[in-house]
């Protein structure tokens, strides 16, 4: 699976960062305040109230859990929370915190009301998670000093702080950890209008000339994800400078994205490979995810975390108790005739009894 994993990481429409350079690029375009943050109106409105209330009381903000598909702005929101609160932000990730001492070192160096951001928090080890519980509730941690019979537990007081946890797999969080977050927010996919605003803002920061229709052409192929929209903008900007006069119009954007093999709904080769496997190898489904993973040479987690969310959200794929099923939209997208109602396995399209 090494080559396949590499291909997944290099997808132009991958929702995860593909290189350190892209991470630096993202930081340069990242909004710095809530008022600059586009989309997620409900979450943004809630955070505005909670942050203002905490500041008026001179308290730390309640612990915040942000979850949703990758690339929607969880890290950006963590930075904005710290900046709006006027405090420092310390950033780490679940897999990095291998030992209890790793977390203890971070916690004991936090100043009053600081923000600790843990990405991929669902990947914390049980040992580290146990240390985190009293820190979240009582701002205290227990550490062991010494070894063997002489070892003893010492309780250390911590400064009040805010934990911001981010995850793409909220269902993998343990109940005790989830219950310790006072603020829980799900980030949703963006619509094309919101993404067009993000593309326009990013183009301005990059000093690129873009027409509204060009921004919308990029936005509608960005799979509802700001990270993808900004990545496509960079590639379209390159195309516009070399193959056009530098202006990003709808025609220029369309030509650039066709060159990149990104179709009108944001599908790339891997998306089409998955959907075509369901259509042609499994007669439209249902097919179990393990069989599907074997058929296209992908990891199960990649299908569930990277490929499926957008396809399901856009109505091209359905999860059923019996497996994955192609929808009528999928047949139409590939120019195929859908099964008739007497033989169809498509749920919910003709037969209300299907599940």
From Swiss-Prot:
<keyword id="KW-0234">DNA repair</keyword>
<dbReference type="GO" id="GO:0006281">
    <property type="term" value="P:DNA repair"/>
</dbReference>
<feature type="region of interest" description="Small ATPAse domain (RuvB-S)">
    <location>
        <begin position="191"/>
        <end position="261"/>
    </location>
</feature>
<dbReference type="Pfam" id="PF05491">
    <property type="entry name" value="RuvB_C"/>
</dbReference>
<feature type="region of interest" description="Large ATPase domain (RuvB-L)">
    <location>
        <begin position="4"/>
        <end position="190"/>
    </location>
</feature>
<dbReference type="GO" id="GO:0016887">
    <property type="term" value="F:ATP hydrolysis activity"/>
</dbReference>
<dbReference type="GO" id="GO:0009378">
    <property type="term" value="F:four-way junction helicase activity"/>
</dbReference>
<feature type="binding site">
    <location>
        <position position="76"/>
    </location>
    <ligand>
        <name>ATP</name>
    </ligand>
</feature>
<protein>
    <recommendedName>
        <fullName>Holliday junction branch migration complex subunit RuvB</fullName>
        <ecNumber>3.6.4.-</ecNumber>
    </recommendedName>
</protein>
<comment type="similarity">
    <text>Belongs to the RuvB family.</text>
</comment>
<dbReference type="InterPro" id="IPR008823">
    <property type="entry name" value="RuvB_C"/>
</dbReference>
<dbReference type="InterPro" id="IPR027417">
    <property type="entry name" value="P-loop_NTPase"/>
</dbReference>
<keyword id="KW-0963">Cytoplasm</keyword>
<dbReference type="Pfam" id="PF05496">
    <property type="entry name" value="RuvB_N"/>
</dbReference>
<feature type="binding site">
    <location>
        <position position="324"/>
    </location>
    <ligand>
        <name>DNA</name>
    </ligand>
</feature>
<keyword id="KW-0547">Nucleotide-binding</keyword>
<dbReference type="GO" id="GO:0005524">
    <property type="term" value="F:ATP binding"/>
</dbReference>
<keyword id="KW-0227">DNA damage</keyword>
<keyword id="KW-0067">ATP-binding</keyword>
<feature type="binding site">
    <location>
        <position position="75"/>
    </location>
    <ligand>
        <name>ATP</name>
    </ligand>
</feature>
<dbReference type="GO" id="GO:0006310">
    <property type="term" value="P:DNA recombination"/>
</dbReference>
<feature type="binding site">
    <location>
        <position position="74"/>
    </location>
    <ligand>
        <name>ATP</name>
    </ligand>
</feature>
<dbReference type="GO" id="GO:0048476">
    <property type="term" value="C:Holliday junction resolvase complex"/>
</dbReference>
<dbReference type="GO" id="GO:0005737">
    <property type="term" value="C:cytoplasm"/>
</dbReference>
<dbReference type="GO" id="GO:0000400">
    <property type="term" value="F:four-way junction DNA binding"/>
</dbReference>
<comment type="subunit">
    <text>Homohexamer. Forms an RuvA(8)-RuvB(12)-Holliday junction (HJ) complex. HJ DNA is sandwiched between 2 RuvA tetramers; dsDNA enters through RuvA and exits via RuvB. An RuvB hexamer assembles on each DNA strand where it exits the tetramer. Each RuvB hexamer is contacted by two RuvA subunits (via domain III) on 2 adjacent RuvB subunits; this complex drives branch migration. In the full resolvosome a probable DNA-RuvA(4)-RuvB(12)-RuvC(2) complex forms which resolves the HJ.</text>
</comment>
<feature type="binding site">
    <location>
        <position position="71"/>
    </location>
    <ligand>
        <name>ATP</name>
    </ligand>
</feature>
<dbReference type="InterPro" id="IPR003593">
    <property type="entry name" value="AAA+_ATPase"/>
</dbReference>
<feature type="binding site">
    <location>
        <position position="75"/>
    </location>
    <ligand>
        <name>Mg(2+)</name>
    </ligand>
</feature>
<feature type="binding site">
    <location>
        <begin position="137"/>
        <end position="139"/>
    </location>
    <ligand>
        <name>ATP</name>
    </ligand>
</feature>
<keyword id="KW-0233">DNA recombination</keyword>
<dbReference type="Pfam" id="PF17864">
    <property type="entry name" value="AAA_lid_4"/>
</dbReference>
<feature type="binding site">
    <location>
        <position position="180"/>
    </location>
    <ligand>
        <name>ATP</name>
    </ligand>
</feature>
<feature type="binding site">
    <location>
        <position position="30"/>
    </location>
    <ligand>
        <name>ATP</name>
    </ligand>
</feature>
<keyword id="KW-0378">Hydrolase</keyword>
<keyword id="KW-0238">DNA-binding</keyword>
<comment type="function">
    <text>The RuvA-RuvB-RuvC complex processes Holliday junction (HJ) DNA during genetic recombination and DNA repair, while the RuvA-RuvB complex plays an important role in the rescue of blocked DNA replication forks via replication fork reversal (RFR). RuvA specifically binds to HJ cruciform DNA, conferring on it an open structure. The RuvB hexamer acts as an ATP-dependent pump, pulling dsDNA into and through the RuvAB complex. RuvB forms 2 homohexamers on either side of HJ DNA bound by 1 or 2 RuvA tetramers; 4 subunits per hexamer contact DNA at a time.</text>
</comment>
<feature type="binding site">
    <location>
        <position position="227"/>
    </location>
    <ligand>
        <name>ATP</name>
    </ligand>
</feature>
<feature type="binding site">
    <location>
        <position position="190"/>
    </location>
    <ligand>
        <name>ATP</name>
    </ligand>
</feature>
<dbReference type="InterPro" id="IPR036390">
    <property type="entry name" value="WH_DNA-bd_sf"/>
</dbReference>
<feature type="binding site">
    <location>
        <position position="29"/>
    </location>
    <ligand>
        <name>ATP</name>
    </ligand>
</feature>
<feature type="binding site">
    <location>
        <position position="319"/>
    </location>
    <ligand>
        <name>DNA</name>
    </ligand>
</feature>
């Amino acid at each position: 699976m090494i080559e396949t994993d590499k291909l997944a990481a290099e997808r132009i429409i991958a929702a995860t960062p593909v290189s350190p350079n892209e991470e630096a690029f993202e930081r340069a375009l990242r909004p710095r305040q809530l008022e600059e943050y586009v989309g997620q109106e409900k979450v943004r409105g809630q955070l505005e109230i909670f942050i203002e209330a905490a500041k008026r009381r001179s308290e730390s903000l309640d612990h915040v859990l942000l979850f949703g598909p990758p690339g929607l702005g969880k890290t950006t929101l963590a930075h904005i929370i710290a900046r709006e609160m006027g405090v420092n932000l310390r950033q780490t990730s679940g897999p990095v915190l291998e030992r209890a001492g790793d977390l203890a070192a971070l916690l004991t160096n936090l100043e009053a009301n600081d923000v600790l951001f843990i990405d991929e928090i669902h990947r914390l080890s049980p040992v580290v998670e146990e240390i985190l519980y009293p820190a979240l509730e009582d701002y205290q941690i227990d550490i062991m000093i010494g070894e063997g019979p002489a070892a003893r537990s010492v309780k250390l007081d911590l400064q009040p702080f805010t934990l911001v946890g981010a995850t793409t797999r909220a269902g993998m969080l343990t109940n005790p950890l989830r219950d310790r977050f006072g603020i829980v927010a799900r980030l949703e996919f963006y619509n094309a209008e919101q993404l067009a605003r993000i593309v326009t803002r990013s183009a301005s920061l990059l000093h690129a000339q873009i027409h509204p229709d060009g921004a919308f052409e990029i936005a509608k192929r960005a799979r509802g994800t700001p990270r993808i929209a900004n990545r496509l903008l960079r590639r379209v900007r390159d195309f516009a400078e070399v193959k056009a006069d530098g202006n990003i119009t709808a025609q220029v954007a369309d030509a650039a994205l066709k060159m990149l093999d990104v179709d009108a709904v944001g599908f790339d080769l891997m998306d089409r490979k998955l959907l075509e496997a369901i259509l042609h190898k499994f007669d439209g489904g249902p097919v179990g995810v393990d069989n599907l993973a074997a058929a296209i040479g992908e990891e199960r987690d990649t299908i569930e975390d990277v490929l499926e969310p957008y396809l399901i959200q856009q109505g091209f794929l359905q999860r059923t108790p019996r497996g994955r099923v192609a929808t009528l939209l999928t047949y139409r997208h590939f120019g195929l005739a859908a099964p008739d109602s007497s033989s169809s396995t498509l749920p919910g399209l003709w037969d209300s009894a299907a599940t």
